[in-house]
């Protein structure tokens, strides 16, 4: 871009399917697990699959997860859970989306929300590090 322009994400990183997007890893993992579920996922099209993978990635990001090891359907089939860790392990982390709502959430929208969430988390981490730095006793 031109010098002096505000820094922006490259146009091609518009959604999580792009490797340059902050949510790409979570999206790719969610999508792979949804594809493995096949008809059990309840998703009717490629677009619903991508939308749901994006929604799962966003909910996992908000839950502080760094990866999605499993995607499982709730007992009633209406909810989908993203799981980080070993199934049944008390330390596993999980996040949940309602399947119908997730299937209708445009991938671009969940991608923008995840990117915003990721950058605000980086800011928080940076400010915590600065505070720790300021609070450290100075040695003579």
Regions found by a protein language model. Give the residues of each.
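Gram-negative host-targeted secretion-system effectors, predominantly Type III and Type IV
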Residues: 1-140
């Amino acid at each position: 871009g031109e010098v002096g322009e505000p820094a922006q994400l490259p146009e091609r990183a518009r959604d999580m399917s792009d490797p340059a997007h902050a949510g790409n890893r979570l999206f790719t993992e969610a999508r792979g697990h949804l594809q493995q579920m096949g008809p059990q996922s309840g998703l009717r099209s490629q677009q619903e699959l991508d939308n749901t993978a994006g929604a799962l990635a966003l909910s996992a990001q908000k839950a502080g997860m760094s990866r999605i090891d499993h995607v499982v359907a709730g007992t009633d089939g209406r909810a989908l859970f993203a799981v980080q860790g070993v199934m049944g392990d008390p330390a596993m982390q999980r996040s949940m989306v309602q399947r119908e709502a997730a299937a209708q959430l445009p991938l671009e929208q969940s991608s923008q929300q995840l990117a915003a969430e990721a950058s605000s988390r980086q800011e928080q981490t940076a400010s915590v590090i600065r505070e720790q730095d300021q609070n450290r006793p100075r040695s003579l």
